[in-house]
Amino acid sequence: MDSTFNELGVSPALIATLKDNNINQPTTIQQLAIPQFLQHQNLIVHSPTGTGKTAVFGIPVIETLLKKPSKGTTQTLVVAPTRELAEQIKTTFINFAKHTHLKVVSLIGGIPIWQQLKQLENQPEIVVGTMGRVMDLLERGVIKFEHLEHLIIDEVDLMLDRGFKRKLFDLLSRIEKFEQIAVYSASYNEETIETAKQITKNGIFLAAPELKQNAPEPDNKLIDQFVCYLFSNRKKQALYSLVSQTRAKSIIVFCDTKKLVDELCIFLRKNDVKTYPLHGDKAQFIRERNLKLFANTTAPIVLVTTDLIGRGIHVEGVDMVVNYSACVNFETYLHRMGRTGRNNHKGSCITFCTSHEKQAFLKLLEQVNDKRISPLRPMRLRLIPLKCKTQPKKGKLSLQSVQKIYVNPRSNGTFKRVPLAGDLFKSRMRQPERDMQKNKLHDSDWQSNM
């Protein structure tokens, strides 16, 4: 399948706008879904990370609304699980509708309601919102969607993970009428598919032939994956050593808790690393500001975050993703890794892994890379002192010396047993002798357990 946007039924004016946004050729899932959407079908779409999911529904929505006379009211409602994703979808719609009369607003938490109500007075054709704020306004009777053409639920699997199943059906019951409903997600399991069928009344399921799996598939060819075995009390210093020596300029560090995000930001800033935090307890204007600063800077920068931006958010040119703790969830690892290696931009994904996390993480990696992995020897971590005046010059040490976490099979099907990242944190400073002895003891313990 190799269609152009013109063959999919997209108008020349919109095609020109897409080219202005560097969208020249439809992806496989766009080729499948856009014609079905334009035929007013209810859809369940599997659009993995990096396949242009927002454009999958954004393009046909704009195309449909431009062909119909304006009703002077909201005609499209898009519901997303997070504020950041809702804002990104809004920005995409604004870019696509740049040369049209269509108006787009967002309804998200963290923004005063009166400001959003004032925007609604302009009768926008497209509203993008989070579940909480949209339901709040519906329950108050402040807004009504009486002439809705399209209802779009984005990242439905994440909504279910966050316990929004009941609210999804409450939303459907409160919207009096809509012509078409479409559900989109980067991954599907049995519960997600069953819920999506109920929501769409057995809508058409669409997935690109090479992507009919239960999880998103980042392009592993563009992402070098590494694992760093270390002790938990060395993680902070290891992170500092990594960001101080790598060539990467744009780094996202994923943490499991909001408290840890704040702790790491304070720690890295004290050691003169330009760092910004991002998590759900931050005020909305701070979240937006930090994400923009991270996305637009050309200087080396670190964004420390929870899984708030692990799904759906696209930041151009991310060089490296760091998992501060080993992921135990297959989809979480893939979504985090998918923040880099986008649009033919090579990236790295590095995971800090302690001894008790090792076995579970290796099994996860076998799923990701579709191959069995032999037990791997732990590395002996050499750390550079904090604020060390004699530390190596930034950019001098590349990641080329680090071996990939997966092992290429020999011709007879067996796998080599190799160390993973012995040279990752090389430094001019020698480790104290007592630490070296301690590491030797721990190394022997790990080795005996393999």
UniProtKB/Swiss-Prot annotation:
Instruction: Indicate whether Coiled coil appears among the record's keywords.
Output: no
InterPro entries, from UniProt?
DEAD/DEAH_box_helicase_dom (IPR011545), DEAD_box_RNA_helicase (IPR050079), Helicase_ATP-bd (IPR014001), Helicase_C-like (IPR001650), P-loop_NTPase (IPR027417), RNA_helicase_DEAD_Q_motif (IPR014014)
Helicase ATP-binding domain residues: 34-206
Q: What class of enzyme is it?
A: hydrolase
Ligand binding (ATP): S47, P48, T49, G50, T51, G52, K53, T54
Where is each Helicase C-terminal domain found? 234-384
Nucleotide-binding listed as a keyword: yes
In terms of PROSITE patterns, this protein maps to:
HELICASE_ATP_BIND_1, HELICASE_CTER, Q_MOTIF
What reaction is this protein's catalytic activity? ATP + H2O = ADP + phosphate + H(+)
Keywords assigned: ATP-binding, Helicase, Hydrolase, Nucleotide-binding, RNA-binding
CC per GO annotation: cytosol
Which CDD domains has this protein been placed in? DEADc, SF2_C_DEAD
Region annotated Disordered, chain positions = 429-450
Name a Pfam family for this protein. DEAD
Q: Please name the GO terms that the record assigns under molecular function.
A: ATP binding; ATP hydrolysis activity; RNA binding; RNA helicase activity
What is the protein name for this chain? Probable ATP-dependent RNA helicase MG425 homolog
